[in-house]
Design a protein with these regions (language model features):
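Bacterial N-terminal signal peptides
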Residues: 1-12
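Extracellular or lumenal secretory-pathway regions
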Residues: 15-122, 126-129, 136, 145, ...
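Short, surface-exposed loop and linker segments with low hydrophobicity and enrichment for Pro/Ser/Thr
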Residues: 17-26, 159-170
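Short, hydrophobic/aromatic-rich segments at coil-to-beta transitions
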Residues: 25-30, 133-140, 168-175
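Residue-level structural signal for beta-strand termini and adjacent loop
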Residues: 142-143, 154
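Alpha-helix initiation and capping sites
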Residues: 145, 166-170, 179
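Short helix-loop boundary/capping segments
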Residues: 148-167, 186-187
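Short, conserved beta-strand edge motifs with alternating hydrophobic and charged residues
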Residues: 152, 175-176
Length: 276
């Protein structure tokens, strides 16, 4: 609880000091994201986290639950926060800047940001229907960067938004699946709140193509599962700063926290959302 409280305080302090309001959310869509993979012993596991999407007038912002206004400083929340570390889910602004998609993520020990023109997903609409929760949905399919997706959308919520980078259908995406990955809508919250972008001068700026390659090279390496920081010098001291990264590493009990963000001792096999 101490760690999560410190994280929340740090995030709030940074946000109030630097963030820019770039749109206003009309509602929030909360998704359960699950990924089937293997742990460092080769056992099948299902990692899960919540993804929160702010749906604005001109843009959307998809983010891990811990980066959203829904986070809470509770013991249960601390476990959810740690679970996010296995899944490498970035924060994605679609439509910021105008016509662009911006992706930001921590690849220890640095934060990275990549931009690209917003890609248009080429969906094939079908007559198939499925009831997902309270919504009657229609099926659509697309292939996006090496993965084929089956998505179900509802025209009951007239928005082209969806989780992560999935978008562009005649209604809100309620469910989307591709191989190891699945997103399922769990809540629609009718609340208005600012959509923000916080400039980070320390973030490493790359083209999105280069960021995607770097992410795949790091997490896709076979060494990652046994030692998630295989590509960095060993560190065992209680606290130290890694050269040129401008981050602080804290060791508490059997966990490591970098700028209050958890770092894994053992990883899970990387299942990329984008392969090309």
């Amino acid at each position: 609880m101490f760690i999560f409280g410190a994280i929340a305080l740090l995030v709030d302090m940074q946000a109030h000091a630097q963030e820019e309001v770039i749109d206003t959310a009309q509602f929030l869509a909360v998704y359960d994201y699950q990924c089937k993979t293997q742990n460092n012993e080769g056992e099948t596991v299902v990692d899960a986290m919540e993804v929160v999407v702010q749906v604005g007038r001109t843009m959307t912002k998809s983010m891990p639950w811990s980066q959203s206004s829904l986070r809470e400083p509770t013991f249960e929340a601390e476990g959810k926060f740690y679970q996010e570390t296995y899944l490498h889910m970035p924060t994605v602004w679609i439509g910021w800047p105008e016509g662009q998609t911006t992706s930001r993520e921590l690849i220890f020990p640095n934060e990275f940001e990549g931009k690209e023109p917003t890609p248009e997903l080429q969906w094939t609409l079908t007559d198939d229907t499925l009831r997902v929760g309270d919504y009657l949905c229609q099926k659509a399919t697309t292939t996006y960067r090496g993965l084929t997706w089956q998505a179900y959308y509802t025209e009951e919520i007239p928005s082209s938004a969806g989780p992560w980078r999935l978008r562009g259908l005649p209604g809100l995406i309620v469910k989307a699946e591709s191989g190891a990955h699945s997103f399922v809508l769990t809540q629609v919250l009718q609340q208005s709140e600012p959509i923000t972008y916080k400039p980070n001068p320390e973030a490493r700026q790359l083209s999105y193509k280069k960021l995607l390659k770097y992410r795949t090279d790091i997490y896709g390496n076979k060494q990652y599962v046994k030692n998630p920081v295989y590509y960095l010098p060993e560190f065992n001291e209680l606290m130290k700063t890694i050269p040129n990264a401008q981050v602080t590493v804290l060791k508490q009990f059997d966990a490591l926290f970098v700028n209050w963000m958890p770092v894994l001792h053992k990883g899970h096999v990387y299942q990329p959302l984008e392969k090309e």
